[in-house]
From Swiss-Prot:
Function: IGPS catalyzes the conversion of PRFAR and glutamine to IGP, AICAR and glutamate. The HisH subunit provides the glutamine amidotransferase activity that produces the ammonia necessary to HisF for the synthesis of IGP and AICAR.
Listed name of the protein: Imidazole glycerol phosphate synthase subunit HisH 2
GO molecular function: glutaminase activity; imidazoleglycerol-phosphate synthase activity; lyase activity
Organism: Prochlorococcus marinus (strain MIT 9313)
Disulfide bonds: none
Record InterPro entries: Class_I_gatase-like, GATASE, Imidazole-glycPsynth_HisH
Metabolic or biological pathway, per its Swiss-Prot or TrEMBL entry: Amino-acid biosynthesis; L-histidine biosynthesis; L-histidine from 5-phospho-alpha-D-ribose 1-diphosphate: step 5/9
Main location: cytoplasm
């Protein structure tokens, strides 16, 4: 059973809104600012708001990057949110920094020829692609709140858990591999549907966190 959750603070995350969301689920989060803080945690949350390059610089300054890579490669659970999803990939159109590289693929700027405003702000429905413990195909209310200008393009289709419409095309909404998952949207700002998703993540953790291939 996994009971101790860590929220990574590297200076570019929407920490308070995530904390409030988990407080509603009666779950306290331990703030992680340095490697020593990881000893108190069984699972991690990597939030993020802002640009890719500054985020990686801030994350490097915490000295957490090697530990985060070891954490995920060791099969321990981590959930990324918004920019936190993008940082899991190898690189981004938004800058020249190297991402964490925990998922293969590149983050691209949203296309300007789709008749949609950029940044993409608002609600969109999820369409399931591959198995993910955060998703419930029987849940009719799967609209989530997005705020972003970039979207990840996974190299491996098996890592793509859900997509969402953007103009005439679709974008990556969720990824999942093993015990590593992430949302491009903000579940903590997605009302009841987002709360149900976070509750499913907690239930998955508390029942053994079985990895998804």
């Amino acid at each position: 059973m996994i009971t101790r959750l860590g929220l990574i603070d590297y200076g570019m995350g929407n920490l308070r809104s995530v904390q409030i969301a988990f407080e509603r689920l009666h779950k306290a989060l331990h703030i992680v600012r340095q490697p020593a803080d990881l000893s108190r945690c069984d699972a991690l949350i990597l939030p993020g708001v802002g640009a890719f390059d500054p985020a990686m610089v801030h994350l490097e300054q915490t000295r957490l990057v090697p530990d985060l890579k070891s954490w995920v490669k060791g099969g321990r659970p981590l959930l990324g949110i918004c920019l936190g999803l993008q940082l899991l990939f190898e690189s981004s159109d938004e800058g020249n920094a190297t991402g964490l590289g925990l998922l293969k693929g590149h983050v691209q700027r949203l296309p300007s020829n789709q008749g949609e405003r950029i940044p993409h702000m608002g609600w969109a429905a999820l369409e399931h692609r591959n198995d993910c413990p955060l998703l419930d195909k029987e849940d009719p209310d799967s609209w989530m709140y997005f705020v972003h200008s970039y979207a990840a393009v996974p190299s491996q289709n098996s890592d793509l858990a859900a997509i969402a419409p953007f103009g005439r095309d679709n974008i990556t909404a969720m990824v999942w591999k093993g015990r590593l998952g992430a949302c491009q949207f903000h579940p903590e700002k997605s009302a009841a549907a987002g709360e149900r998703m976070l509750r499913r993540w907690l239930n998955w953790l508390e029942t053994g966190a079985k990895p998804v291939p």
